[in-house]
Amino acid sequence: MDFGFTEEQQAAVEAARAVFSSVAPDAVPSPSLTPGPVAPDFDRPLWRRLAETDLLSLVIDPEYGGAGLDPVALCLVLREAGRVLARVPLLETCAAALAVQTYGNGELRSRLLPAVGRGETVLTVAASGRTGHEPAELAVTARESNGTWLLDGVQTAVPWAQQADHILVPAHTAADRTVIAVLPRVLEGVSLADQVSTNGERYAELRCDAVRIPAADMVTTTGAWEWLRDLLATGNCALALGLASQVTAMTSEYTSKREQFGHPIATFQAVAVQAADRYIDTRAMEVTLWQAAWRLSIGTPGPLPITADVSVAKIWASDGMRRVVQTAQHLHGGFGADTDYALHRYHAWAKTLELSLGPAAAHEERLGGLLAAHSPG
């Protein structure tokens, strides 16, 4: 088994680290210090730097001005973004662009992808459904009529919706098919109601009331939504890995310097064992992430559907990240809750990611169903 990355993927990591080195996590707006949203907009200067270093066009094909790399490369960059709590819609924009590129029509690709790569167009995805506990594709209905589509329904917790130029909205048809509408944010029948996430970022409830969409702005290919949903989940696992890795490093540094009874507390067995267990969590998160990202990249069938590998990655990301952050707070003591220190920000972002990923028990149940359905003989 080869866990190495290609030269192009390693170059993407180096570029991402250079860009994200300018982000100070302890300066990220804190939900503990700000009532309501922590900021009206995402980090636009950082977004411009990502565009200037071609990281926004990383997965876009060369014919549209991009590098043409794969989901593994995207996840490598997202891991670096998670380390510093980067306040940019990098996952949503790149995942949506890759879905349009893979499943959209030529006119839609030509209109959106070059602008996305230049940082001029921001995309997001409505992936939480009506309540956050139901399939997103069931929250909105789509009906074709005279060459256009009519959308009705509600999606909650749409990240970066107020700043996005287009929102990709999954919807179900009367024929029990799932389609994706590439919805302009400003359009008759579209309304956004402000919501605030656990980390203080602006989310929105999206309401579609007889919204009319031209056929050219619809992605109707079978399997497109399922693929995009898995890519978003894998990207969130990459963000979780970056966050957990950084928190583990912070804990290691703190416990190595904090002394009690004349010795660094890292030398005490109770502390060392807890820290070691959390390191094992991050390693498991890493291995399962790259398995899922690799399956998405190659796209070839395996003994189980790609969704199974994504479910395993989500199980470890959701539970592992939570354990890492909770142990970090415990080992830091009162210092971990100090708002002048970055750890409480990581805790808030971890909770947001955990809620986005969903509970591990649900993924375990889904994985069990897949194993039963695909068991040999």
Per-segment meaning from a language model:
Residues 118-130:
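A short, Trp-centered hydrophobic/proline-enriched beta-strand micro-motif
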Residues 140-143:
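A structural signal for short hydrophobic beta-strand segments in well-ordered beta-sheet cores
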